[in-house]
Amino acid sequence: MREYKLVVLGSGGVGKSALTVQFVQGIFVEKYDPTIEDSYRKQVEVDGQQCMLEILDTAGTEQFTAMRDLYMKNGQGFALVYSITAQSTFNDLQDLREQILRVKDTDDVPIILVGNKCDLEDERVVGKEQGQNLARQWNSCAFLESSAKSKINVNEIFYDLVRQINRKTPVPGKARKKSTCQLL
């Protein structure tokens, strides 16, 4: 079974843990409890393939920055999360993406831009088109709006990253085996 190392990044309070726990355990975490680092494992089926996801739920961008390079070095796919109710959390993501590309030393990194808390439409300050435009600027990276509370697009975030990783690095052993003939 193929393993995938996914990293959830973004400012404090955007709902990184809520999305991760909703995906892994099917529970909405109401209370805000700042994360230092939590790791979760979940087996899922994506496009008929069994996958083991290892999801690293990280501290907000303003904390524990020394650990961030290590997450980025080891991660294969990244969910960059902002809250649609806080412009500053959206603005923080540009530097985060640049840091990922610098650490990975490539522009071709599986990334999904996630506008979380889309259930709070009355409190929206970051328009959906702002997210779409930023995703286009980022080499047309994937973009979704989500809500951990309302279970909107939660699974899709992680499944999309798995699909991006599969496109970038196809499953080994899928190629047709060459047959050889030996004369003795």
Swiss-Prot record:
Lipidation (S-geranylgeranyl cysteine): C181
Positions of modified residues (Cysteine methyl ester): C181
Gene Ontology, cellular component aspect: anchoring junction; cytosol; plasma membrane
Propeptide, chain numbering: 182-184
Subcellular location: Cell membrane; Cytoplasm, Cytosol; Cell junction
Family matches, as InterPro entries: P-loop_NTPase, Rap1, Small_GTP-bd, Small_GTPase, Small_GTPase_Ras-type
Reaction(s) this enzyme catalyzes, per UniProt: GTP + H2O = GDP + phosphate + H(+)
Main location class: membrane
Alphabetized UniProt keyword annotations: Cell junction, Cell membrane, Cytoplasm, GTP-binding, Hydrolase, Lipoprotein, Membrane, Methylation, Nucleotide-binding, Prenylation
GO molecular function annotation: G protein activity; GTP binding
Top-level enzyme category: hydrolase
UniProt xrefs under CDD domains: Rap1
Motif (Effector region): 32-40
Positions of GTP binding: 10-17, 57-61, 116-119
Gene3D superfamilies in UniProt: P-loop containing nucleotide triphosphate hydrolases
GO biological process: Rap protein signal transduction
Its EC number(s): 3.6.5.2
Function in brief: Probable GTP-binding protein that possesses GTPase activity. May play a role in endothelial cell polarity and endothelial barrier function.
Family indicated by similarity: Belongs to the small GTPase superfamily. Ras family.
Name of the molecule in the record: Ras-related protein Rap-1b
Organism annotation: Cyprinus carpio
Name of the gene: rap1b
